[in-house]
Amino acid sequence: MKIKGKKLLLCMAAVMMMGGAKAQGTDAPVATMDLTLKEAISVALAENPTIKVAEKEIELKKIADSEAWQNLLPDASINMNLQHTILAAEMKLNDMTFKMGKDGVNTAVGAATLNMPLFAPAVYQTMKLTKQDVKLAQEKARSSKLDLVNQVTKAYYQTLLAQDSYNVMEQSYNISKQNFDVVNAKYGQGRVSEYDKISAEVQMRSLNSSLVSAKVGLSNAKLQLKVLMGVTANVDIKINDKLENYESSLVLANVESSESELQNNSALRQLDLNESLLNRSLKIQHTNFMPTIAFQLTGQYQSLYNDHWNVFDYSWSPSASFAIAVSIPLFKASNFTKIKSTKMQISQLQDTRLNTKRQLGMAVQSYKDNMASSIAQVNSNREAVKQADKAVTIASKRYEVGRGTILELNQSEVALTQAHLTYNQSIYNYLTSKADLDYTLGRENF
């Protein structure tokens, strides 16, 4: 997604938040953001500092790429020198003394120099190296985005799980409270024993404690999601979604895995690019055995033996020259050890890539197995919820007519609560395994 599109989405979200802003006791504005998974990912990609750092790193590599080819451009400089001779040197030859200049005079020289490389193999290879470095920075930025999308996706599903768990516990608590009210009323009429009243009250208070814990878990899940999105603490997020809505999208994972599946994995791509960089570095080191050719053009004005300091009144004489310099390396021991070291690094990188690919292949297979297992669990747990709900209805009727006990009623309610939680957990397990699989395979779901 383009950055402009992200910013537009963020502005729309800000308008929505301001529309729902309230003022509490401290007059701190509290905004509410209606959130979907797609919106959460878009906001995170636009605002997360890690992504911004990765994008700036790409710009730095592009600047380095520009610096590389600029080494082929001419280099021009101007130098000026004003020298005052206090005492000129003397030369003696066969008892004769010759003065090498004059005492107390000024010599002025102004020179312009132009240097330009004609053949610089190291520069050519460095230019190719920096282009590979830009690609590596882009792949690292892509890896950061994939990692962030994976974290946001799982945090979103974690929030859904916490939200659904809270709703289940709230529903169970309300049912237990209704049962306690009924049992307490019957106890007041002398129709049930005190044991039934105590059991119903214990059940209600136990579920109330679980409800409080579920509420804390929901708050923590939302906080984690907001941190990943880069959303401030005074913004509340509202998710009109639940895990049950994703049941229809559960697809049995393909058990077979192919070699091409991992071609988009960012870790393998980075290893390949690093190997390319090492190969390019090896070629740069080989250029240490090649000659270099440079062109130099020099022009200068000089004025000699001036007895005053007014340079504008000097008598200047021009001169110019050019030179072609050829440098041929003959021997440098460190060049050979550098090449040997780089070849060893390439070999290490190849072994690392092979091991990484094997581990990723096992991870992919594990995620697929978990997805297949979760689908089977979802199908089983769905039926368990239906049966547990039916059992609660039967236990309630039996207790109302005096054929059942409070223990049966409590057990049926606990079984229903557990069935709902297990059902939601199995869907969550599938979705998180699917998110990890997408991340491992380098799927860009953004």
What positions do the PLM features span?
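Bacterial N-terminal signal peptides
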Residues: 11-19
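Extended amphipathic coiled-coil alpha-helical segments
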Residues: 53-71, 116-117, 124-157, 161-185, ...
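Residue-level detector of the transmembrane beta-barrel scaffold of outer-membrane proteins
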Residues: 75-79, 113, 126, 270, ...
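A short glycine-centered flexible hinge/capping loop motif at secondary-structure junctions
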Residues: 187-191, 399-403, 440
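Bacterial Sec-pathway N-terminal export signals of envelope proteins
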Residues: 23-77, 81, 233, 239-279, ...
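Acidic, low-complexity, intrinsically disordered peripheral segments
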Residues: 2-11, 24-30, 41, 422-446
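Periplasmic alpha-helical coiled-coil/stalk elements that build and connect Gram-negative outer-membrane
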Residues: 2, 7, 22, 35, ...
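Small/polar, glycine/serine/threonine/aspartate-rich low-complexity segments that form flexible
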Residues: 25-33, 79-116, 242-250, 283, ...
